[in-house]
């Protein structure tokens, strides 16, 4: 039987936080991630309820994914963060979408470790991953790609409590934290202009933030469509055992690997169909009425993202992207 990702028992974590001098080992997890889950980002179609969140899973020793629900209109889906616990502090990859949800994540991290949060990597500069950054404790080092600085400044104009990152990187940053090697990489423009990924080479875990949307309709508001495909192919070449999405569910390593390819093919479908309609001379509005994106029409966020994705491909074809 292949290794699966195991949910943390939140009850056990709460007991660990009660201050016992030598806490007992956590009990065995109550359940495992399904070997072949329903392939959807809709929590209700998976038989989950709001009470099942946040979900925390240990991907490798001391490496955790954190899934919380967020709403887009009437739809609910997950926003995923990752955190790495070391003897010298905790690194968090992506916050959540508001102060309360990020504060809850900080609280849950505190149930797992007494180590302080030392680093926050802004992997996506979108507000659903950064608008709660003011909830992180003082003294945190924020890391951002140079292409995302302007976006963070715009968010801070709306939410002054958000700290501006002091560490600005370009292509690569290597950290050693508590003996762990952590690679922060820019693999190219994708969902945004400054997507960063966090790679743990020894644990073979790769956090792909919003560049990897697991059964969520390709969201292209600020994307670079064909560059996005190329970026994800470079991510595949890393060959990580666990590929963690920024939205959608954290499933078994095998499912996540397969679904990364599905996500690439979803992008290619949007690009190909939009290009076909563009070559017919249709306006974006006319194209939106005629477009057929196949199975993607059933994916989460189709209603809000379909037309936007088509228009973004048109912009790329017209040479209008920055």
PLM region spans:
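C-terminal motif of bacterial Sec signal peptides marking the signal peptidase cleavage site
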Residues: 15-17
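Zn-dependent metallo-beta-lactamase
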Residues: 19-88
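C-terminal regulatory/interaction regions
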Residues: 21-22, 279-322
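Metallo-beta-lactamase
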Residues: 53, 58, 147-188, 192-194, ...
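Conserved beta-strand hairpin/beta-sheet module of binuclear metal-dependent hydrolase folds
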Residues: 58-108, 198-200, 205-210
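Active-site neighborhood of phospho(di)ester-bond hydrolases with catalytic His/Asp-centered motifs
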Residues: 93-95, 118-126, 143-147, 187, ...
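Active-site HxH/HxHxD metal-binding segment of metal-dependent hydrolases
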Residues: 100-103, 107-176
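Divalent-metal (often Zn2+) His-rich catalytic cores of metallo-beta-lactamase-fold enzymes
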Residues: 229-282, 286
């Amino acid at each position: 039987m292949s290794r699966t990702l195991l949910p943390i028992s939140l009850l056990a974590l709460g007991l660990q936080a009660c201050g016992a001098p030598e806490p007992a080992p956590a009990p065995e997890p109550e359940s495992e991630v399904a070997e072949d889950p329903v392939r959807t980002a809709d929590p209700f179609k998976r038989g989950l309820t709001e009470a099942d969140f946040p979900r925390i899973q240990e991907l490798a020793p001391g490496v955790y994914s954190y899934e919380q629900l967020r709403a887009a209109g009437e739809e609910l889906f997950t926003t995923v963060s990752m955190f790495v616990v070391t003897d010298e502090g905790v690194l968090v990859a992506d916050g959540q979408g508001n102060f309360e949800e990020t504060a809850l994540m900080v609280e849950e991290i505190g149930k797992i470790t007494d180590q302080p949060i030392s680093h926050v990597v802004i992997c996506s500069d979108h507000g659903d991953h950064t608008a709660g950054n003011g909830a992180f404790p003082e003294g945190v080092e924020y890391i951002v790609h140079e292409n995302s600085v302007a976006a963070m400044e715009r968010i801070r104009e709306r939410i002054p409590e958000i700290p501006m990152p002091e560490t600005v990187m370009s292509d690569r940053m290597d950290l050693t934290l508590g003996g762990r090697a952590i690679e922060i990489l820019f693999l190219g423009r994708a969902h945004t202009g400054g997507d960063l990924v966090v790679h743990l080479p020894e644990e073979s875990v790769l956090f792909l933030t919003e560049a990897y949307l697991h059964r969520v309709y390709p969201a292209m508001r600020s994307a670079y469509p064909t560059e996005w495909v190329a970026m994800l192919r470079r991510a595949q070449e890393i060959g990580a055992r666990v590929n963690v999405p920024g939205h959608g569910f954290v499933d078994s390593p095998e499912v996540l690997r397969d679904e990364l390819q599905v996500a690439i093919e979803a992008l290619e479908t949007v690009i190909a169909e939009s290009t076909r309609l563009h070559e017919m001379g249709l306006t974006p509005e006319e194209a939106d009425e005629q477009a057929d994106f196949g199975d993607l029409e059933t994916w989460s966020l189709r209603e809000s993202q379909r037309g936007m994705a088509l228009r973004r491909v048109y912009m790329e074809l017209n040479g209008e992207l920055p």
